[in-house]
Swiss-Prot record:
Keyword Transcription regulation among UniProt keywords: no
Lineage start: Eukaryota, Metazoa, Chordata, Craniata, Vertebrata
Location of N-acetylalanine modifications: A2
Function noted in UniProt: Involved in RNA polymerase III-mediated transcription. Integral, tightly associated component of the DNA-binding TFIIIC2 subcomplex that directly binds tRNA and virus-associated RNA promoters.
Entry similarity comment: Belongs to the TFIIIC subunit 5 family.
Annotated GO CC locations: nucleoplasm; transcription factor TFIIIC complex
Listed PANTHER family: GENERAL TRANSCRIPTION FACTOR 3C POLYPEPTIDE 5, GENERAL TRANSCRIPTION FACTOR IIIC, POLYPEPTIDE 5
Pfam family, one: Tau95_N
Localization (cell): Nucleus
Name listed for the protein in its UniProt record: General transcription factor 3C polypeptide 5
């Protein structure tokens, strides 16, 4: 390649070998790199860069002082590109034995393509203020306070009583690193003698968002009667949306489900019928009503069916089950092989995440029963495109739940031991209570306790190393405490919840989320 470059003139093309198998990622580092070993820790090391690259929604963070916990990073945006990483070597050969002006040096260039760059990270934002744990003395001398502020090991009581200069970092750094134009409006000027009207609901705008036109009927446990038919607005909305044979078929399938079983959760419906989520929001209020409180809360019930008057509805009651984790149970939240539905660490804050553009769903797609995936030839079959797995509503022994908080119906607990607990009072159901329904008191607590033990055994079989160190400390204690999920808990259970159950673990109140879809 070097010889060819020497023979060709200026501006001539040179053939090079393209190594397509070498895909690379480029980081436009905002500085002069003299030592790669010191540069990598500022980006989180190879492991940190790999973790950010694996998630296309994350931004690459650069810490100027990696060991300083008060260092605020600058963030790089991720872009797709089609670039080449080219290595060029200039070689100069001087003629031996020739001195003076008659000496000519032979210059050659070696060019080599090291790989193809498909992803590039660019630092385009502004850097925020940096706060240093430094104290300025009277004479202008700066003294570091890191050894007095940071706890690198367990300290004695004297460490907390030492005299220190006041050092208060900001409670929050800037959430945005890009300049934004703010258009200030002049203050409204009124004529002389104008008085502001009294504050009331009549002259205030935007007290709440507009009600969504899904027209669902909500029923509380203490309500005397249940609706026998949907609202006329719900029927009209579904007739307006139901414009193709696919929608009519889905309606027939949903009616058959409610004929077989009068009470369903939305996840259970999604696991049995393939229907677009937006269509299901409109269809469910046309077929069933929604129970807010009681043992059938967060469930959809067929119009005209009152579970409070039918003991057979016991098997359709809901069980709010949450996986409890903590060191006393033998595994930490990070060790649990069950993901959280959402986490405070994954929220899309502008400082850490560059949100990807969402795919739009057109009215044509909804009318045809399609989603935002393009043409029907490149999609999954319509019979299974929107279907969920059975594990979202069925509990089986030996299988872990997909999330740390689950809402099961009692009939979907496919374990013989659990069904025995449920059917202990068959034929002797005297009354239906808001807490236990048609079951015996504390039935839900016993079910959670048994399910927790099953999950502990499953985790032990999948990851035995987690329990090797905790077995001695536990002293053979196998029982895993449970969380009732009810309002009527004693003080001891509340203390355990505060200790073990963290909101950041991602448990999500599905009932509130579902209600918000219709309010």
């Amino acid at each position: 390649m070097a010889a060819e470059a020497a023979d060709l003139g200026l501006g001539a093309a040179v053939p090079v070998e393209l190594r397509r198998e070498r895909r690379m990622v480029c980081v436009e580092y905002p500085g002069v790199v003299r030592d790669v070993a010191k540069m990598l820790p500022t980006l989180g090391g190879e492991e940190g860069v790999s973790r950010i690259y694996a998630d296309p929604t994350k931004r690459l963070e650069l810490y100027f002082r990696p060991k300083d916990p008060y260092c605020h990073p600058v963030c790089a945006n991720r872009f797709s590109t089609s670039s080449l990483l080219l290595r060029i070597r200039k070689r100069t050969r001087r003629q031996k034995g020739v001195l003076g002006t008659e000496a000519h040096s032979e210059v050659t260039f070696d060019m080599e393509i090291l790989g193809i760059i498909s992803t590039i990270y660019k630092f385009q934002g502004m850097s925020d203020f940096q706060y240093l744990a430094v104290h300025t003395e009277a004479g202008g001398k700066h003294t570091s306070m890191y050894d007095k502020v940071l706890m690198l090991r367990p300290e004695k009581e004297a460490f907390f009583h030492q005299e220190l200069p006041l050092y208060i970092p900001p409670p929050i750094f800037s959430r945005l690193d890009a300049p934004v134009d703010y258009f200030y409006r002049p203050e409204t000027q009124h004529r002389e003698g104008y008085n502001n009207p009294p504050i009331s609901g009549e002259n205030l705008i935007g007290l709440s968002r507009a009600r969504r036109p899904h027209n669902a009927i909500f029923v509380n446990f203490e309500d005397e009667e249940v609706p026998k038919q949907p609202l006329e607005a719900a029927a009209q909305t579904w007739r307006r949306v139901c414009t193709n044979p696919v929608d009519r078929k889905v309606e027939e399938e949903l009616r058959k489900l409610f004929d077989i079983r009068p009470i369903w959760s939305r996840n259970a419906v999604k696991a049995n019928i393939s229907v677009h989520p937006d269509k299901l929001k409109v269809l469910l209020p046309f077929i069933a009503y929604y129970m807010i409180t009681g043992p059938w809360r967060s469930l959809w019930i067929r119009f005209g069916y009152d579970p409070r008057k039918n003991p057979d509805a016991k098997i359709y009651q809901v069980l709010d089950f949450r996986i409890r984790c903590g060191m006393k149970h033998g595994y930490a939240p990070s060790d649990l092989p069950v993901k959280a539905k959402r986490s405070t660490y994954n929220y899309s804050l502008p400082i850490t995440v560059k949100k990807t553009s969402s795919q739009l769903v057109t009215m044509h797609d909804l009318k045809q029963g399609l989603g935002p995936s393009g043409t029907s030839g490149a999609r999954k079959p319509a019979s299974s495109k929107y279907k969920l797995k059975d594990s979202v509503y069925i509990f089986r022994e030996g299988a872990l739940p997909p999330y740390r908080q689950m809402f099961y119906q009692l009939c979907d607990l496919n374990v013989e031991e659990l069904q025995k607990i449920i059917h202990r009072n068959d034929g002797a159901e005297n009354s239906c209570t808001e807490r236990d329904g048609w079951c015996l008191p504390k039935t839900s607590d016993e079910l959670r306790d048994t399910m927790s033990l099953m999950i502990r055994q499953t985790i032990r079989s999948k990851r035995p190393a987690l329990f090797s160190s905790s077995a001695k400390a536990d002293g053979g204690k196998e029982q895993l405490t449970y969380e009732s999920g009810e309002d009527e808990e004693d003080e001891e259970e509340e203390e355990e919840e505060e200790e073990d159950f963290k909101p950041s673990d991602g448990s999500e109140n599905e009932m509130e989320t579902e209600i918000l879809d219709y309010v």
